[in-house]
Design a protein with these regions (language model features):
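Extracytoplasmic beta-strand/coil segments of soluble accessory domains associated
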Residues: 65, 69-109
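Gram-negative outer-membrane beta-barrel transporters
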Residues: 328, 386-393, 401-402, 510-520, ...
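Conserved C-terminal beta-signal and adjacent last beta-strands/turns
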Residues: 13, 234, 383, 453, ...
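Structural signature of Gram-negative outer-membrane beta-barrels, strongest in the C-terminal barrel
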Residues: 328-336, 340-342, 370-518, 550-552, ...
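Short acidic/polar hinge/loop motifs at secondary-structure boundaries
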Residues: 109-137
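Transmembrane beta-barrel wall of Gram-negative outer-membrane proteins
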Residues: 165, 172-201, 206-243, 265-287, ...
């Protein structure tokens, strides 16, 4: 019986695969996000786009949004500095738990423990030195479970080299931007290792802004006595001076306001550490893999976007394991089953230095101080059946349990820190911030997926799939309450997705097309009275495409994009809406219908690549009534990469070639428009050295 390809054999296979510069080799690209083991995209009943190493090196992203703009249905909405919000087959979600809709991972392991997500957590992974970034769109498979509701972003670490190797890339750009990416690795008697260092300084385009960022990745692979080990240590440190929203309708079109920063006092400091070790060995007729891991994070930042600008301090420690046993039951049937577990302890404190003038419900002092102990356990099974040579059927089921043990370290209730009410003497009122009493909350949910891949000949395939996903409430949604609410009676969000696809390669053209329809229930939101409730619904449908056409010997045209509608299903009483406002069928806010990246690539000779990218962002509404909107924008980017010799290379990147005035993110809140203004035309130069 042939054993599945896993462990050290998997690492070797992935290391030997050539990187695809565009979409042309996507069907042959091997990914691990769908099942935790190397698998060609052509075998998966899912929509996965892998941004290859060559693409990452050509883009040399200053912000991860630049690299992922070429993934259909995906928008990493850039804030200031390293900040961002995520959208995959969804609007851009905001709010304390909205990030729970996405499974953000490094080598298949979540960047943060279940229930403790952060909207900016992609900044905590060394994507700048990754082997590739895999994006699965739609609910994940049985190996993911909670949080893989709208999609998965999996950053794959660079493997150790086959022989001693070293590289250094220096980047310079506007506003004092400077970055050094260094890598060194070698082989040992029973394995190999690689050390990656990333240090970046950005002086900031906006006034009184900028950041210093350091990341380290140490990958070590080894094999002894029939056991293979893949391990990774990741460290990160961010010190950021944050610029806030610029207020006023169409402010991004005013040349005198391009560098404006209304919040020069804002900052974000964040330190992270992660380690895992994946041990793989033969076990009976199959292969067993066990991956213990550890995570640590500590953050301080000023909430400049809130009245009173309270200081938030948060962090966590977590440890656990992933496990799986992979066995071929016969020549046509493979089973993957496993047990995952995780423990975490997290904390959050919020303190406001000064009272807000004229607003008695926002007092100075401490608002929150709590700890949460989290336990997460899951059992899963995934079957792959090939009844005919041209037919593959996948089915997966996961049962996941999440438990929170919450400890309030302040007085219970909606009072000041000392227990006195807010308001005026003789007219007491509850304070804005509410602290529940100590409690335990538990959630148990299933996730399942079913898919069919049918080879119809001529290098073409048809794909049909159904998936059910969920996300438990995040701890902040349960315990960081407002407006006198002392119990958040909310349950897990649920999503059902059906999808059909057509993909193939024919002569000089490769393509992937997908159409999906998704329904969500129990959506958690803050209502008009600032209470966390969970009874909203939404509908999502769209078409996604990836096409690569090599129309001449040295020329190729690639396009990735989406046309989608994300709409409210019902009249949820969202915060800020007058009572009785009808929004059923309206577009959700910050949900552009059309997004696209089209790239013309020219390779006149070996080691020379030029790329012109057109990036389209469609119009979107800024609030649920469809009264205020952002018109969208078109950007052009030019990139040139030249290998000078075996040891030296250089590249030039000109972003926003036409100097378009645009907004990276537009919003409407507190009665006015506000924007993160996009940066003007910018020139970046890279000089690279390779051993």
């Amino acid at each position: 019986m042939q054993k599945p390809i896993t462990g050290g054999r998997a690492a070797l296979l992935l290391a030997l695969l050539p990187a695809a510069p565009g979409i042309a080799a996507q069907l042959e690209t091997v990914v691990v996000t769908g099942s935790r083991a190397p698998q060609p995209v052509s075998e998966l009943a899912a929509s996965i786009r892998a941004v290859s190493s060559e693409e990452l090196q050509l883009v040399r992203a200053v912000h991860i949004s630049e690299a992922l703009s070429r993934v259909p249905g995906t928008w990493i909405s850039r804030g200031n500095g390293q900040e961002h919000l995520t959208a995959i087959r969804s609007p851009v979600f905001t709010g304390p738990g909205s990030c729970g809709a996405f499974y953000l991972a490094e080598d298949g392991l979540r960047l943060r423990p279940a229930g403790v997500c952060n909207v900016n957590e992609l900044s905590e992974v060394n994507s700048e030195q990754a082997a590739r970034i895999e994006v699965l769109r739609g609910p994940g498979t049985a190996v993911h479970g909670g949080n893989a509701q709208h999609g998965v972003i999996n950053v794959i670490s660079a493997p150790p080299p086959e022989a001693r190797d070293a590289s250094l890339t220096l980047t310079g750009g506007p506003n004092g931007y400077a970055r050094a990416l260094g890598s060194y690795g070698d082989r040992t008697d029973n394995g190999a290792w690689r050390l990656g260092l990333n240090t970046t300084h950005d002086g900031g385009y906006k006034d009184d802004s900028g950041y210093d960022l350091q990341k380290l990745s140490y990958r070590h692979d080894a094999e002894w006595s029939g056991v293979t080990l893949q391990s990774l240590l990741s460290l990160g440190n961010l010190e950021q001076e944050t610029a806030g929203f610029v207020i006023g309708q169409d402010a991004y079109e005013d040349s005198d306001r391009q560098k404006e920063n209304p919040n020069p006092e804002a900052f974000r400091d964040n330190q992270v550490a992660r380690w895992y070790g994946r041990f793989t060995l033969d076990a009976g007729p199959g292969v067993l893999s066990v991956t213990p891991f550890y995570r640590y994070q500590d953050m301080r930042f000023l909430q400049h976007f809130l009245l009173g600008q309270p200081l938030e301090e948060n962090g966590f420690k977590s440890s656990g394991w992933q496990s799986e046993w992979r066995v071929a039951l016969d020549d046509a049937l493979e089973l993957v089953t496993g047990l995952d577990g995780e423990w975490s302890t997290s904390f959050l404190q919020e303190t406001q230095r000064d009272a807000v003038p004229g607003n008695s419900v926002l007092p100075a002092g401490k608002h929150y101080d709590y700890e949460v102990e989290g336990l997460n356990g899951a059992l899963f099974a995934q079957l792959a059946w090939t009844p005919l040579a041209a037919t593959r059927i996948d089915a997966g089921l996961r049962l996941e349990h999440q438990r929170y043990d919450y400890d309030n370290r302040m007085l219970d209730g909606a009072t000041r820190e000392d227990g006195t009410p807010c308001g005026r003497p003789g007219a007491p009122v509850p304070c804005r911030y509410s602290r529940p009493a100590d409690r335990v909350d538990e959630f148990t949910e299933p996730a399942l997926n079913l898919g069919l891949v049918q080879d119809i000949g001529g290098g073409q395939e048809l794909v049909l799939s159904y998936a059910h996903g969920f996300r438990p409430p995040q701890s902040a949604e349960l315990y960081r309450l407002q407006a006198g609410q002392l119990v958040a009676d909310i349950d897990s969000e649920q999503v059902d997705n059906i999808e059909a696809g057509w993909r193939g390669t024919r002569e000089a053209v490769s393509w992937q097309l997908a159409a999906y329809y998704m329904q969500k229930e129990n959506i958690i939101f803050q209502d008009a009275e600032r209470r966390n409730v969970g009874d909203a619904r939404s509908r999502h449908r769209g078409i996604e495409y990836s096409v690569d056409w090599r129309f001449a010997e040295h020329w190729a045209l690639a396009a990735d994009g989406t046309y989608a509608r994300h709409r409210y299903d019902g009249n949820a009483p969202l915060q800020g809406l007058p009572a009785g406002t009808g929004i059923d069928g309206n577009d959700m806010d910050t949900a552009p219908r059309a997004m696209a990246s089209v790239r013309l690539r020219w390779e006149p000779r070996e080691h020379t690549t030029a790329e012109l990218e057109w990036q389209h962002m469609g119009r979107y509404f800024l609030e649920p009534t469809e009264t205020h909107d952002y018109e969208g924008h078109e950007l052009l980017h030019l990139r040139l990469n030249q290998q000078l010799s075996r040891h030296f290379s250089w590249s030039v990147r000109l972003t926003n070639l036409t100097d378009e005035q645009y907004a990276d993110r537009a919003d409407f809140a507190f009665g006015d428009y506000r924007y993160f203004i996009g940066e003007p035309r910018s020139l970046f130069v890279d000089i690279g050295w390779q051993l």
